[in-house]
Amino acid sequence: MEFARGQNLRKRTFSDMNISYKNIGIHPNSLPKNNLSRKILFKGKISKNSIPKDSLTNGKSSKNCMSKNDLAKDNSPKKGLIGKKRSAPLDISFQSMNSSMSSSTQKKTRILDEKNKDQSSSNENDRDSPVIVDITLKPSYTSKISRITEIIHKMKELNINRIEDGLSFNKKRNEHDAKNILLHTMEMVEEDCEEEEDVIIENPYLNASLSEDDTDSIVGTDYSEEEKESISETESSSDGECYSLYDSF
């Protein structure tokens, strides 16, 4: 098995990469796309098929070869891309059309075509080219917290609405019950009044204070004076007989 020299590997790894300084370490798509550099950067080893023949020396490869351990040692993160910290994506980042942009990092893109009304002004020259607005989602924990707070607020609103609906319903129900009670009492009073009127009609002299004229009119005073005296004598004699009977006992 033939191995490549470390010098050739470093030359092909870092000189053939066409990557801007801003995109270093942001996403794997921004790394070189040839198999050689990918395997060196991520696995620390290369296979025979992935190395082009031009990079291998003729005749001196066996003397100046590197083992796998030496190759891993040479891939130190001093000068290369390995070991670079990955920058956190911003919530909203503006990039021009010419700059390379990976499709996985951007969630929503929108092209804003802004035309200059006054092309002579230097401040508005940057607006000639369209701009891509990259809106990436926030981390998951923030979205969960915001979602939980939204759910709590919605539940509070629903509970408040239910309480208000219940209060209004209870008010309406109480008013309805009060109206029913008033109607029922009014009906009872009317029935009592009707019964009293019926009793008064049947017995017109039951609760009335009767005078002597009324008694004379009720009994019918067609008697003569002699008859009245005889009636009074009979009443007095009957009273005396009753006393005599009681006294005998």
Curated annotation (Swiss-Prot):
Residues 93-106 have a biased composition (Low complexity). The keyword Transport does not apply. It comes from the Viruses. Induction: Expressed in the early phase of the viral replicative cycle. Keywords: Early protein. Belongs to the asfivirus DP238L family. Residues 110-129 have a biased composition (Basic and acidic residues). The keyword NADP does not apply. This is Uncharacterized protein DP238L. It comes from African swine fever virus (isolate Tick/Malawi/Lil 20-1/1983) (ASFV). Residues 51-67 have a biased composition (Polar residues). Residues 51-131, 205-240 are annotated as: Disordered.
